Amino acid sequence: MNHHALPHPAHASLTTMPTAPASTAEMLERLDALLPGVEERAARLDGEGGLPVEEVAALGAAGLLVAPLPAALGGLGWGSEPGGTKPLMRALRRIGRASLPLGRLFEGHVNALRLVAAYGTPEQVEEAAADARAG
C-alpha cells in the first residue's frame, strides 16, 4: 500500500464524498479526515522540492475549494460572508499545521476568489465559482 497517497488509507472512502459543502461542521470534518495523509506527505514533498498537487486535488474532491464562495454561489461563505471568518481561520490553521505550502496555496485560493468577487464582472465571478466547484 502506498502510504503517501491521498486520501489517507484510513479515510479511503473520502474520494466518494460529494463536493458540495453541506455545513461548516461537515467541511471541517472532511478536512480533518484529509490531514493525516497531507501531513504524512508534507515532509517528503519538502525534501524533494515537490508541489502538493495531490493534496490540492484532495481539497477539491472534499469540497474545500468551494467553501470560500458565498452561499449564493454554492459555498459556505468562508472569508466572504459574515460568520465565515472563524471557520476560515480554523481551516487555514489546520491545513498550515499539516503542510505550510498547502496552507499558503489554500490561502491564495481564498484571496483570489475574494478579489474576483470584489473587482470582477458578473461573468468572471461565475467563471471563478465554476472553477472552484470543479475542483
Region locations from a protein language model:
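Glycine-rich flavin
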Residues: 53-61, 66-135
